[in-house]
Amino acid sequence: MQKIAIISYFHYESSLCLAKSIAEQGVTVDYFAIIDMFHDKGTVPGIDYHKAPKYPGLIRLTSVNAPEICGYYEGLPVNLFLFRLVSFSRRLTLLNKIVFKIVLNKIKSAKYDAINIVGQWPWVEIIHNELKDENLTHTFHEVGSHFKGELSTPLMETVIRDKSKVILPSKSTLDRFRTLDKNGYCLSEYIPFGKFETLMLYRKPTELKIQFNNDSPIFLFYGFIKPYKGLDLLKRVCEILNDRKVDFNLIVAGSGDDPTLPFYSTKKNCVVINRILYDDEMMYLNDISDVVLLPYKTASQSGIIPTSFIFGNPIIATKVGALVESIQDGKNGILVNAEDAVSFADAMQSLITDQNLMSLLKHGARQYGNGDE
């Protein structure tokens, strides 16, 4: 039986479902989740491991110390490990290098048929340099900064120099990477996100409670708040709907800063949660909402899409980057031109007034990941 390793530096929810898909094909998968001992809360998106031993190095997850995630793979050849660093801080580089050396030597000694490294943080270059003589594939969720237009990073340059294989989650990011790899040194391919199913293993009540004074649909904007995500466009959309006297509710949730946040805070039909969201809060917000909004100015891809679709929430989005690859206009969402506030307002209003359309798009959202998208 073939045996592969997946080493995930963040992006756990996307790589955990990949491990399941590969294991269902009869391939043994050893999954390594890189975590930080100093700032460890006992959970990352998709894995609750608070019962696991707390020391640096490799810790195997079992049905005793991580029953939910181990149950997710029941009957499948998947082995789960924590790859615990001392700290993600660069001030402890020496200690981390010792942990890396010990763990990566164990991984090399396992003689895997293939190794997939997920993530692009600077520490990944240490892993790459130790494992570059193995049958190595990198998965990058982003290439540079799509907002600043920066493509190259030291890690990207190293991967291209060493002619590694690379997986990208969207055609948009694949095109960006191939622009960077102008000589075609790397074998690069596009594999989309699967369902972020493991998030649903840990649903629990949350202290966060939101109530509106009407029964109008609830629209949700969530995730890290950054200028390219278009809250200024959404402000113009809200003003248009208010002028039309259309009733709706809006939640703006996530950490970050934007000059339009005071506008939303003053609106009676809007709730602003300007901080980092816990997983249970993110799931609660999706539970109580009807539609998710992505008024982005630019985008490569977004984990918001598969997360929202799990809850059956259709998405209204602008036609930028990879958003058009997963959101199908009239099937699981509505797509409008970038910076077109009137069309975005029209899309929101259509879902407020047309329950048949709302039901159709919710059904389409739930079908995401079933092979028909």
Regions found by a protein language model. Name each.
Residues 12-16, 92-104, 115-133:
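An aromatic- and histidine-rich active-site surface loop
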Residues 161-202:
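Donor nucleotide-sugar binding/catalytic pocket of nucleotide-sugar-dependent glycosyltransferases
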Residues 212-229, 235-238:
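Conserved donor-binding/catalytic core segment of Leloir-type glycosyltransferases
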Residues 260-284:
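Nucleotide-activated donor-binding/catalytic signature segment of Leloir-type glycosyltransferases, i.e.
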Residues 291-294, 314-317, 327:
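Short hydrophobic beta-strand element within catalytic cores of glycosyltransferases
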Residues 296-298:
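Aromatic "clamp/platform" in nucleotide-sugar-dependent glycosyltransferases that forms part
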Residues 306-307, 320-330, 334-335:
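Short acidic/histidine- and often glycine-rich active-site loop of Leloir-type glycosyltransferases
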Residues 343, 350, 357-372:
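A short, well-ordered alpha-helix in the C-terminal region of glycosyltransferases
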